[in-house]
Amino acid sequence: MSPRAIVLKEPNGVNLVPHEGIFDISPVAGWKPLLPTDQVFGIFVVFIVLLTLFLVYWIKLRKADPLRNHSSFVLLMQMLFVWAQDTTADLIGEENKKFTPYFLMLLLYLVSSNLIGLLGGISPPTSSLTFTFSLGLATFLGIVIMGIRYQRWSFFKSFTFNITIKGKKYSTLIPNPLSFLGEFAPLFSISLRLWGNILGGTLILALFYNFWFFAFSTLSNKPLALSLGAIFAGILTPALHVYFDVVVGTLQGYVFVMLTYNYWAKMRNIGLEESQEAAQRLQNLEVAKEIIN
């Protein structure tokens, strides 16, 4: 996590508690929408990293000899694309394979955003609730589009109260508030899950770093105390960085992508089941007519 995102405050005025963009929730007096935050710089760095990655892949692919083995980097990128394409086809259908670039880019962007905190002075974009909420909004819009595409009018009927008459369900024009809340739940769940995990790692590392500084603060020689704190923190914290930045960061990016797959697949599967039920009812009706005739 970025040291700039871990700011502390002592009684003499030195910052010791995380505050930038985390606990400042006053939207009127303290809100400065035009003031860039640390995460904005992190987003720019991630963009440069991914752009460089794709340019290197494109150049290596153009220079590659089809009669010879490709480089490890080219093979890794191709394997990643094939995995994303197969996963897209398996979960949301062959007809939606055109969404493969989106899911692949989403995975690379999230993993890069989480790992960028390993670079000193750069805050991970995912430590900003605005950033994760924007990604969650894209997932939510995809849910709505998939629902309308496969369920048609049934998607809108799911937001109203249904009544059952003689075993058949009929939709009313009365809105069901619980259905609306349930539809918006994935938006908040997927956004807060990612943000909470990254922010939690940031806070734990902040506490761990400053524990060693406080442990040696009783020494009369302040420069020596700070030096010893930095040495012990530098020796013991790499394992925590590997877990919170690399393991958790990569895992949370993968989880976000798979949840997006599942939410979209749910809308598609409901629509396909309704279509199959309608086709089965029509087939039964035709069979009944043939028997009567």
UniProtKB/Swiss-Prot annotation:
Membrane protein topology class: Multi-pass membrane protein
Segments traversing the membrane: 39-59, 73-93, 102-122, 128-148, 172-192, 198-218, 224-244, 245-265
Keywords: ATP synthesis, Cell membrane, CF(0), Hydrogen ion transport, Ion transport, Membrane, Transmembrane, Transmembrane helix, Transport
GO process annotations (BP): proton motive force-driven plasma membrane ATP synthesis
Record InterPro entries: ATP_syn_F0_a_bact/chloroplast, ATP_synth_F0_asu, ATP_synth_F0_asu_AS, F0_ATP_A_sf
Pfam families attached to this UniProt entry: ATP-synt_A
CDD domains membership: ATP-synt_Fo_a_6
GO cellular component, one term: proton-transporting ATP synthase complex
Subcellular location, record wording: Cell membrane
Molecular function GO labels: proton-transporting ATP synthase activity, rotational mechanism
Complex and partners: F-type ATPases have 2 components, CF(1) - the catalytic core - and CF(0) - the membrane proton channel. CF(1) has five subunits: alpha(3), beta(3), gamma(1), delta(1), epsilon(1). CF(0) has three main subunits: a(1), b(2) and c(9-12). The alpha and beta chains form an alternating ring which encloses part of the gamma chain. CF(1) is attached to CF(0) by a central stalk formed by the gamma and epsilon chains, while a peripheral stalk is formed by the delta and b chains.
HAMAP family: ATP_synth_a_bact
Function: Key component of the proton channel; it plays a direct role in the translocation of protons across the membrane.
PANTHER family named in the record: ATP SYNTHASE SUBUNIT A, CHLOROPLASTIC (PTHR42823:SF3)
Family (UniProt): Belongs to the ATPase A chain family.
Protein name according to UniProt: ATP synthase subunit a
Naturally occurring in which organism (per UniProt): Mycoplasma pneumoniae (strain ATCC 29342 / M129 / Subtype 1)
Biological classification of the source: Bacteria, Bacillati, Mycoplasmatota, Mycoplasmoidales, Mycoplasmoidaceae
Designated gene of the protein: atpB
